[in-house]
A protein has these predicted regions:
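DNA major-groove recognition helix of helix-turn-helix/homeodomain DNA-binding modules
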Residues: 30, 49-64
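Short, basic-rich loop-to-helix N-cap that marks the start of a DNA-contacting helix
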Residues: 43-53, 72-73
Length: 74
């Protein structure tokens, strides 16, 4: 049985909003399209290095990548 990862709600949302294909993002980040799909759908969780790459690529926080929501300071 494959281990379940954390679903990256913001990642899929950002990619769709920007009109980017999984293949384009995967190629830009030097990963497989399948790996990106697994991250988006929670079949695999990215390590910290990949979270930082994704965060930099989309210019958003890691929190946003995971939740799809902006966090505001109180």
């Amino acid at each position: 049985m494959e281990k379940e990862g954390c679903r990256m709600l913001g990642l899929k949302k950002l990619r769709a909003e920007r009109g980017l294909s999984q293949l384009k993002v995967a190629m830009d980040l030097s990963i497989s399209r399948e790996a990106l799909s697994y991250y988006e759908n929670g079949r695999r969780s990215p390590d910290l290095q990949m979270l930082l790459k994704l965060s930099g690529y989309f210019n958003v926080s890691i929190d946003y990548l995971i939740t799809g929501r902006e966090f505001r300071k109180a």
